[in-house]
Swiss-Prot record:
Domain of life: Bacteria
Key words, A-Z: Amino-acid biosynthesis, Cytoplasm, Histidine biosynthesis, Isomerase
A UniProt-annotated Pfam family: His_biosynth
SS bond list: none
Main location: cytoplasm
Protein name, UniProt field: 1-(5-phosphoribosyl)-5-[(5-phosphoribosylamino)methylideneamino] imidazole-4-carboxamide isomerase
Length: 239
């Protein structure tokens, strides 16, 4: 199972939101590159980046910072937030050279666009982030709740050819109360998608629980920044 540390970017800083609320933000570092390099020294192989500015307005805002992190580490980077057109995808995958892009809003609103990307780049490089609030998919940086039930949407993604999804329970994100394993277990039973858990990780026991259930991956953010989890130990165990 992949253990993927996360850095959320806003105005060039590393931040975390509480339950996706842009007004409830904690700044953890003014130098996200240093954090990425620290993750690499600890034994991380992958890095989850979110451009929160991009997610909110639909345009990339931390591009040069992402490029710098890619150039100055050997981490396999996945990036999401504001990726809603072909030029942005091409820039990330072909120019900057990140390993994976994460589509959220675009996957909901433009399924034909998603299909084109899957054909051109393959499902290993196109990941869909499914953000869930009260049983429905949310978009636009979690600010808009759709009328789309999450299981129906996941079935649709599977039919289109998506292989990997990052599933976030918004009500858990940034709360340090543990992931919604009931939700993730249900999703795993209902389809064959690779499921990456995101939101609510509180300590090492959550990583161990996810490993036992054979999920594809788990994203760790606030639990690390608040000193609740020993990531170096988990990286050693994973390798």
């Amino acid at each position: 199972m992949k253990i993927i540390p996360a850095i959320d970017l806003q105005n060039g800083e590393a931040v975390r939101l509480y339950k996706g609320d842009y007004d409830k933000k904690t700044v953890y570092s003014k130098n996200p590159l240093e954090i990425a390099q620290k993750f690499e020294r600890m034994g991380a192989t992958d890095l989850h980046l979110v451009d929160l500015d991009g997610a909110k307005i639909g345009q990339t805002r931390n591009l040069e910072l992402v490029r710098k992190i890619k150039d100055e580490t050997r981490l396999k980077i996945e990036i999401g937030g504001g990726i809603r057109d072909f030029d942005t995808v091409r820039m990330y995958l072909e120019q900057i050279g990140v390993e994976r892009v994460i589509l959220g809003t675009a996957a909901v609103e433009k399924p034909d666009f998603l299909k084109e990307l899957l054909i051109k780049y393959g499902p290993s490089r196109i990941v869909v982030g499914v953000d869930i609030r009260e049983g429905f998919v949310s978009t636009s940086g979690w600010l808009e709740k759709t009328s789309l039930p999450y299981l129906s949407f996941l079935k649709k993604l599977e039919r289109i050819g998506v292989k990997t999804t990052i599933i976030t329970d918004i009500s858990k994100d940034g709360t340090l109360t543990g992931p919604n394993f009931k939700l993730y277990d249900e999703i795993s039973k209902e389809n064959s998608l690779n499921v990456i858990i995101s939101g609510g990780v509180k300590d090492n026991s959550d990583i161990q629980r996810a490993t036992r259930s054979d999920f594809y991956g788990i994203i760790v953010g606030k639990a690390y920044y608040e000193g609740k989890i020993n990531l170096e130990k988990e990286f050693r165990n994973a390798n």
